[in-house]
Amino acid sequence: MKSKYIFFAVSLFAALSTNAQETYENAKLAGEDLNGTARYVGMGGAMEALGADISTIGSNPAGIGLFRHSNVSLSAGLLMQSDGKEFSNGKKTNLSFDQIGGVYTTRTGQKSFLNFGFNYHKSKNFDYILNAAGSLNGSSQNKQSYIKGILGDENSGGFFVRKDNNGKNVGYVDATPPLPSTPPKVAYTWSQIDDLYWNSLIPGSTGTYNYEKATGYTLDRAHTGYIGNYDFAVSGNLNDRVYLGLTFGMKDVNYKGYSEYRENFNNAGGVLVRDERKVTGSGFDITAGVIVRPVAESPFRIGAYVKSPTWYDLTTSNVTRLVYVSGTTSPEKGIGNSYDFKMWTPWKFGFSLGHTIGNNIALGATYEYENYANINSRVNNGGYYDYYYDQYYESSIPDKNMNAHTKEVLKGVSTLKLGVEYKPVSNVALRMGYNYVGAKYANDGQKDPGLASLGTTYSSTTDYTNWGEINRFTLGVGYQVKKFNIDLAYQYSAQKGSFAPFSNVKDITYTSGTTKITESNIASNTDVKNNRSQLLLTLGYRF
């Protein structure tokens, strides 16, 4: 973003009827962990040119063409978080079933094969506990909602608050009620968290609108769930020189997050917001790849591949509760909702090199690029029914507002993967790998609570984290006994981030009576970490 503050008063984006998820929530679903077989993980995943491992089915399916024998494998292990404290149902150590798959080989010529593969692997493990705390110096989450009410105009990031027919405060587009024949229109900038504050804390006991200043905050959030990939591939080789592969992939999304956000007020009271959110759904993508041995007498290989966007069809739902405490406990205020949306991830491109020395050394290197600024949030805007096939097809259009915000906050990411395998004896392999994954978030990016989008309307939290680059270090060992193999891998992943409880708003001026008042709501960022280790075991059989 061009500035670290959001200036609501100059209108970030024009209002538009939209229905899509918020940028930071979408970013959680994009990208992949390093996971698969223990051999693949032990070599840092740098096998897109070396091939002959089932885990390449999802990156460069041409690698499936290097199998000479049919093979099945199964992988599971432990995922361990180094930092933080356990919270709710979040645990720092979790069992994980990570992979099962196989390859069936068929010979089509003296040096040519046509191979078929299937593999399930957990491409993203959400198990992670986030703990954050910091000072606020008079700013607060409820002040953000209060300022939006001051701004009024939806195009300026605000809303006009008045009572509905049930006596509840609602943020509307119009400053005055429309004609009785015209239903009032709720502003897209009116979020679920705004609804909670404007119907509890901001009116107070007297009904006079005001906000509470806070001295500090704490947040605890337990992320759980996964994205599971189901990949089906066909791959073949031409005279053991050119290998081609194509994968059709399906994805299963199961994410759950539960958080408790607390603020301590200057008046010795405080607020607690409990939020539970789920994201479920499915998606599919297509991957194509090629591996070439440019010199017939050399094992040196060059690989290239491209992965289409993952076309997701998702449902997000939440239940959020607010407890306002000012000397005594007040009744909880609750709100919840659910809606469907679509999201398309960016294209991914990869280039890889592989080489073997004799029968005991293998070297691999892979470079990948994926531009997360091109995440496409989609609006479900209707559909049509195909009576011939007895199917309903839902249509969608881009959420222009949210996609523009995504381009401000997210960016292109380069990934470098390096790996080596050494066999001191023919049936024992030692492996080592390294990954560098660039940061997908802009350093000064932040949520935009004034965005006219249903991604804002259904938002139930205000915090966000700008995560930095990832460094992964891997080790592995493999042992072969006749047709059986057992492999073990260890992975350490380190990532730092900058957490903020809400977005910064600076220098909003309004008139109260004859007095001009200028408000700002600034939150200091807090450093957080996502450091975790993985132990992974693979059992395989060749036939």
Predicted segments — roles?
Residues A38, L50-S59, I64-N137, G225-G228:
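Outer-membrane beta-barrel translocator/receptor signature
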Residues M1-E25, L539, F543:
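Bacterial Sec-dependent N-terminal signal peptides
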Residues Q21-N35, Y40, T105-F543:
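Outer-membrane beta-barrel porins/channels
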